[in-house]
């Protein structure tokens, strides 16, 4: 059985890999030491579409599916586990609000999560 990534999956993987290697990895030690993922990393992940991989296009997501999400998570996780947890929680919250929230909640929160304007988490 031969499995190949779709063009979208390969693009998301490659985008996440480049970002992880060039931006996330060099800051991983400081991120862990400070016990906080820098806000600008979330903003950059949002710009790249990494915070809404499974969210609908109309809400700022990529609508790219679970395989694309797993590929992106693997790349970010390899560079910095802390950053990947923040990415995972933000994606998860966006997906839950999209699935179970009202239209008003979707418009208010999901778009902000997908773009990195807002970040999900309360781990203080």
What is each model feature region?
Residues 25-124:
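Glycine-rich flavin
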Residues 11-22:
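A non-catalytic, amphipathic alpha-helix used as a structural packing/dimerization or gating element
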Residues 1-8, 12:
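Intrinsic disorder at enzyme termini
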């Amino acid at each position: 059985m031969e499995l190949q990534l779709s063009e979208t999956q390969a693009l998301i993987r490659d985008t996440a890999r480049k970002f992880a290697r060039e931006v996330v990895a060099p800051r991983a030690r400081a991120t862990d030491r400070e016990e906080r993922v820098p806000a600008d990393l979330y903003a950059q992940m949002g710009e790249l579409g990494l915070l809404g991989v499974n969210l609908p296009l109309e809400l700022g997501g990529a609508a790219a599916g679970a395989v694309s999400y797993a590929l992106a998570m693997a790349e970010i996780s390899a560079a910095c586990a802390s950053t990947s947890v923040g990415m995972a929680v933000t994606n998860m919250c966006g997906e839950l609000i999209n699935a179970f929230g009202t239209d008003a909640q979707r418009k208010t929160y999901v778009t902000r999560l997908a773009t990195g304007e807002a970040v999900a988490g309360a781990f203080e």
